[in-house]
Every structure is written in C-alpha cells, then in structure tokens.
Amino acid sequence: MIGWLKDLLKANALDESPVARDRTATPPATTRPAPTGQAGDSVRAAPGETLAKQLALVIDLNVCVGCHACVTSCKQWNTSGSAGPLADERPYGADPTGTFFNRVQTWEAGTYPATETIHFPKSCLHCEDPPCVPVCPTGASYKRKADGIVLVDYDKCIGCKYCAWACPYGARELDETRQVMTKCTLCVDRIYDDALPPEDRKPACVKACPTGARLFGDVKDPDSEVSAAIRERGGYALMPEWETNPANRYLPRRVTRSQ
C-alpha cells in the first residue's frame, strides 16, 4: 500500500502543489517551533526499525460518554503550547473547519428499540509503520526513535497534504492559517516537562477524562497499565487490514445491562 501510494504521488501529486512546482518558493511562515525543534537523523526512526519503547493511548469505549472533555483540553493545551496556536476558522455548523488534534465521533447503532449510542474518540494512532512518513516530500513527517511518537517538523512542512492523503484514519489536518499539517503529538511538550508534577506528565486528554476512558503508557512494556488493559480486555487495533500497526488501541464495549 505504501509503495503504491509513493509511486502515485511521485508520478502525479507533486505537480499539483504550487509550492512543489516552484522549488524556490519560501515555505509558509510558522509562529511556533515544531514540538521537538529541528528533527535531525539522530532522533528519527528508520523505516521498519523496531523500537524498544512505544508510547500510545488505550481508549475504553465502554466508559467513554462523549463529553468532549478530551477534545477541549487538547485544544486548550496545544493552542497555548509548542504545537499552537491552532486555527478556528469555522468551528461550528454542518461543515466545521479548524484544527483539532482529537475528535469524538458519535452515532447510534442497532435497531429500535434495541439501540445504543456509540462514542468513538479518534486522533493520530502513532503507527509502527506510519504511511504518512515516507510520502512526505520534505521529510517533515517523522517517527521518533526514543518513544515512537509520530511528529511534524513545522519548519520543513509545506502543507502539501500528502500525509493526510496517505493516512487511512483521517488523523491529519491542515492548519489553514499557518499552512502546515497538524496532528496529535501525545503532548510531547507536556509528558517530559520536569516542571510539572509527575501525575500531570500525561497527555491533556488523559488528564481531563472524567471517566478514566483514556490510558497512556508504553505498549512495549508488558508490565505497563496499557499493556495489561490490552491483554486483559482484548484491546484491538483500528483497521488492521491497512497493515500500519497502530500503537493506539481500543478496548471494546461490553453489554452492561439486559437488552
């Protein structure tokens, strides 16, 4: 899938971007540095490299109530942090636009009267084999060696959207104001901040969730909370047929009352 997509982009899509056509054009200015500053080769994972550590989210669909606390806390932290400011051109209405790293989709399942409401939070899954990385023409998109987090170097990003086309989960968004691609960073500027109390060194969405539906940790550590939850609750990967090996996992819903 990735090889086919790379061939297609090389053959056609590069000609569609005004910035790509004019290689002397200056990339769009950014108002903040990338979450990790300049990302040299020393911090980038090589394609297919096996990492010893992989930070990720595990989301319990059984207790998510769709309150959007994760969405608003993510927006607040990242707008004021190193990834922001995040644009809000038209945040409300039938066709909202604006930059969100995390969204909650809600729908009704089943047939009346045996119906139920499903709340499904979705953000970047920090895949082990992220298709967004090899298609980036400037090397702005990369996966970190140290913890497996997938990030965007804003100083290199030209907003061409190739990574958004490659992502099967719709996890990347163009910030229309800054003209750079944005996505969940797992609050990388927060989880390593020694100025914060240890209990606060977790993604803003995890800290804000009132039902404890969001867990955070190293899925490569068999003794971690997230690994135990995946093992004991049957945590599953989203759309495994794409072979991206997403790090984030979901815990399935359970029947908690008689239907």
Regions found by a protein language model. Give the residues of each.
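Non-ligating segments of multi-cofactor redox enzymes
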Residues: 1-259
